[in-house]
């Protein structure tokens, strides 16, 4: 059996991906659940039937089936099953990612496939979504192994240490299967690299499954040359091709785009490892082109476009979160200096040691005060502290966002009709008034709550109640 920590890694890896376990009917809800149970039981259990039949499977001591009742408390990693009402025919099934998001046992947040019925076309990927308990009748709880039992089993074979805090260059997996589209040739080598944070949750090779055949409309939204996580490099485009990765004509044409993956979901430890693989790859490419790592050849996305990218790296190595506060030119130079030093170590055949700043000692944000009590950051976002509870009255619900208060940022989820959330910040940006809060998992989320006209400062009707 896998541990809960190993199950958590699996769950995070499946966000925004599609799982077709049996090769039939595309990405059905049951495919993800079957694959999950098969994974955490080390291949011992392969569930059968439709989603509603999951509760009738025999798990041979690897999991326990619980019938839902008003006081039942689900846990992270449980499998939740719908079998009644609209779900009586086939059922629905998902994996619990937050057992009680609002602290009232009225809702559960899950990772699921095919909620909207488009899994058969493979256009609906695994999504984190919050539901009330309508139709939910059972939970299946894997009997996870304890960390201590796993450690005891592993004591006979101890892996050799790998390059201190750096990477094992010999174990990097490269996949150079490019996207199914011929981008324009540059005609000369890139003049440098630009390091991005992906604002996503997928590994480098998972991006291949998601983007390789995604189609022109998706690529036009942005496509880099390489997508990199720990020990994984997917080269989506050859170095001779122009990529669309920094919303700047010169940057797109002349710089090689590297996406450091999982910037929204990876632990600090994991993201630092992802960075190291990216630094090594940057050093390898620069050396190939006869370029040395310096301020002209190592670039950041925010040097070319008004963006928070690379938000996670900035927070770790400078101590400032660009989604919440202003970033100065000095901050940019500080992060570039860190990137250059790390890349240069690999360039010279040495092994760098990743470092992070003391978050408690981070620089206070630069603020511009307006006459109405709002502060303005260098992205033009008006913001101020405000603590209250917002209850959604929009029948269709409201989409929430990661990264920042922009409708182009990655979707975090949906606050459904009747659901409430407690927030601590209010912003005005991108044609809307937004509220922001930090989830139990430590992620910052933004949600628009009414329209806003920047020219007149007129606000539309509120999409809920504040109390």
Curated annotation (Swiss-Prot):
Binding site for Zn(2+): 196, 301, 309
GO biological processes: defense response to bacterium; peptidoglycan catabolic process; proteolysis; symbiont-mediated cytolysis of host cell
Residues that, per the record, bind Ca(2+): 20, 22, 31
Domain N-acetylmuramoyl-L-alanine amidase intervals: 189-311
Cofactor mode of binding and number, as noted: Zn(2+) is required for amidase activity.
Active site (catalytic residues): 29 (for endopeptidase activity), 92 (for endopeptidase activity), 112 (for endopeptidase activity)
Protein name: Endolysin PlyTW
Cited InterPro entries: Amidase/PGRP_sf, Amidase_domain, CHAP_dom, Papain-like_cys_pep_sf, SH3-like_bac-type
Cofactor: Zn(2+)
Record text about domains: Contains a cysteine-histidine dependent amido-hydrolase/peptidase domain (peptidase C51/CHAP domain) at the N-terminus, a central amidase domain and a SH3b cell wall-binding domain at the C-terminus. The CHAP domain contains a tightly bound structural Ca(2+) ion and it is present at the N-terminus and is associated with the endopeptidase activity. The SH3b domain increases the CHAP domain activity.
Annotated transmembrane regions: none
Residue span(s) of domain Peptidase C51: 4-141
EC number, UniProt record: 3.4.22.-, 3.5.1.28
Family the entry assigns: Belongs to the N-acetylmuramoyl-L-alanine amidase 2 family.
Location of region: Disordered: 148-169
Reaction it catalyzes: Hydrolyzes the link between N-acetylmuramoyl residues and L-amino acid residues in certain cell-wall glycopeptides
Cited CDD domains: PGRP
Recorded superkingdom: Viruses
Claim: Hydrolase is one of the keywords in the record: yes
Gene Ontology terms for molecular function: metal ion binding; N-acetylmuramoyl-L-alanine amidase activity; peptidase activity
Keyword Protease: yes
Domain SH3b: 385-455
Keywords: Antimicrobial, Bacteriolytic enzyme, Calcium, Hydrolase, Metal-binding, Multifunctional enzyme, Protease, Zinc
Chain's role: Endolysin that degrades host peptidoglycans and participates in the sequential events which lead to the programmed host cell lysis releasing the mature viral particles. The CHAP activity cleaves the peptidic bond between the D-alanine of the tetra-peptide stem and the first glycine of the penta-glycine cross-bridge. The N-acetyl-muramidase activity cleaves between N-acetylmuramic acid and N-acetylglucosamine bonds.
Gene name as annotated: plyTW
